[in-house]
């Protein structure tokens, strides 16, 4: 696709695959709104006061129908918004078209190259010559990363005149990042400093991005305040767990039509995502094996009737492999060569480095057969056996299906709206330093409460005497910060 910005009749910038899909996208947005009570409650509660009036928000988060409802909640509260996806395969093109036509600048389409992906990220951050966004909604930390790397390069350029050299790294994706920063230096050597100086803060959606933020905080390199949305209970214990329980089998069946019952499934990692994936496979009738490094998580898995074994002990027995760890080098090409014919290998962690795709792509004589988009059979020349890789080792539930359902994403995205409001409302108070924060317990409970009515649930009320007996306020919060749900 030619990388040039287009404009709507109203003058709004965009780059999407097909604007003729906008009406279809609008119909699905209207369906999703009914399933997203938390976001709709935010519109009702905060819309009249327009708390985001004057705020610029950049989003780097999967451009799906559910994200469209989030975007239109932010604009309903007064924000100006520019958006890109955080994964090359996760955009739903009808959602991107509807939002680009009706609501905000969107730069996203399904099946981006890495070059296109980072171009879209740069466009979403580009608010013109007077700096970037006030706030960032990030998922995986790529928008945050680009600003940090840009500031670092500008400081080096100012000090020594050195410009980023893409050849200085073997990582093909980071070469693209350095090229973008290098080109930016030529037009404005303070471009990313201007962004950094304007930024109020970022709210981060997922485990991988949160890890990046805590690493920067530990190293003293974090440039602006950050709210860790991922570790809100109403995000990690719902989106990560129940969302993956729903979307993993959806992606598997859309991609392969595989019969899960009777198969052996291996789930690498037994955190919240792994728990949801293991539950889905077990409920579908698979025999589930878990790999784990953490003895506590391993013990939890055994208490659920799951086997816990190292990958190398069972690699030749497994039919379906799912990586969920957020770590790298979980399944290597040496493991793939030992797998049974047509074993399915997929990842539901954020990045594509859990499965050794580079090792597979460069294996001598390996043959790639594309069955359909995001479903490839790779055949090893020496064994004649093939394995099926989904979404090129990237997020399979969004690459091969449509991700998590609207209701569970309403929990996550309501946390995002609240986090963005918190950062914006406190921008001049000094409350938030260049550190990583989590939302307080009473807001977590509020997000949960907003979703109960839709499910027909009613809470029991404490009396004052009962509340005093267990030392909590009648109106909550009901659990201490350290409570493990």
From Swiss-Prot:
What EC number(s) does this enzyme carry? Answer: 3.13.2.1
Cofactor(s) recorded for this entry are: NAD(+)
- Classification via Pfam families: AdoHcyase (PF05221), AdoHcyase_NAD (PF00670)
Tell me the tissue specificity.
Mainly in floral buds and stems.
GO terms (molecular function) for this protein are: adenosylhomocysteinase activity
Q: Which UniProt keywords apply?
A: Hydrolase, NAD, One-carbon metabolism
Q: How does it assemble?
A: Homotetramer.
Query: What HAMAP family does the entry give?
Result: AdoHcyase
Q: What's the stated role of this polypeptide?
A: Adenosylhomocysteine is a competitive inhibitor of S-adenosyl-L-methionine-dependent methyl transferase reactions; therefore adenosylhomocysteinase may play a key role in the control of methylations via regulation of the intracellular concentration of adenosylhomocysteine.
The name this protein goes by in its record: Adenosylhomocysteinase
Gene behind this protein: SAHH
């Amino acid at each position: 696709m030619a990388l040039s910005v287009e404009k709507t009749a109203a003058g709004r910038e965009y780059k999407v695959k097909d604007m003729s899909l906008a009406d279809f996208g609008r119909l699905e947005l209207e369906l999703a709104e009914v399933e997203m009570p938390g976001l709709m409650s935010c519109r009702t509660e905060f819309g009249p006061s327009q708390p985001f009036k004057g705020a610029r928000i950049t989003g780097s988060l999967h451009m799906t129908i559910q994200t469209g409802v989030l975007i239109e909640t932010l604009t309903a509260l007064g924000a100006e918004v520019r958006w890109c996806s955080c994964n090359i395969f996760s955009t739903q093109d009808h959602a991107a078209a509807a939002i680009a036509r009706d609501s905000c600048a969107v730069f996203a389409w399904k099946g981006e190259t890495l070059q296109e992906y980072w171009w879209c990220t740069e466009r979403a951050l580009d608010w013109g010559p007077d700096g970037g966004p006030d706030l960032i909604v990030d998922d995986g930390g790529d928008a945050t990363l680009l600003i940090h790397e840009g500031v670092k390069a500008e400081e080096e350029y100012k000090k020594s005149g050195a410009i980023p050299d893409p050849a200085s790294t073997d990582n093909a994706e980071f070469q693209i990042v350095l090229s973008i920063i290098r080109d930016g230096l030529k037009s404005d050597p303070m471009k990313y400093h201007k962004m950094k100086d304007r930024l109020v803060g970022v709210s981060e959606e997922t485990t991988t991005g949160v890890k990046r933020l805590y690493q920067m905080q530990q190293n003293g390199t974090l440039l602006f305040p950050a709210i860790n949305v991922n570790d809100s209970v109403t995000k990690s214990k719902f989106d990560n767990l129940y969302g993956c329980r729903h979307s993993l089998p959806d992606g598997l069946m859309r991609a392969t039509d595989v019969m899960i019952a009777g198969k052996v499934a291996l789930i690498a990692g037994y955190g919240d995502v792994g728990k949801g994936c293991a539950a889905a496979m077990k409920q579908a009738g698979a025999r589930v094996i878990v790999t784990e490094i953490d003895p506590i998580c391993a013990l939890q898995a055994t208490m659920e009737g799951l086997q816990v074994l190292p990958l190398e002990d069972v690699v030749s027995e497994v039919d379906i492999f799912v990586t969920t760890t957020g770590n790298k080098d979980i399944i290597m090409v040496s493991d793939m060569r030992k797998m049974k014919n047509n074993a399915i290998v997929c990842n539901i962690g954020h990045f594509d480095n859990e499965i050794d795709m580079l090792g597979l792509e460069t294996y001598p004589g390996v043959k790639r057969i594309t069955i359909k988009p995001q479903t490839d059979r790779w055949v090893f020349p020496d064994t004649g056996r093939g394995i099926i890789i989904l979404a090129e080792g990237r997020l399979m539930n969004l690459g091969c299906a449509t991700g998590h359902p609207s209701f569970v994403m309403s929990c996550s995205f309501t946390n995002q709206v609240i986090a963005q409001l918190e950062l914006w409302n406190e921008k001049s108070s000094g409350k938030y330093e260049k550190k990583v924060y989590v939302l307080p317990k009473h807001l977590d409970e509020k997000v949960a409460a907003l979703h109960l009515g839709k499910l027909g649930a009613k809470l029991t009320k404490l009396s004052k005497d009962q509340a005093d007996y267990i030392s909590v306020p009648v109106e909550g919060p009901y659990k201490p910060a350290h409570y493990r749900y």
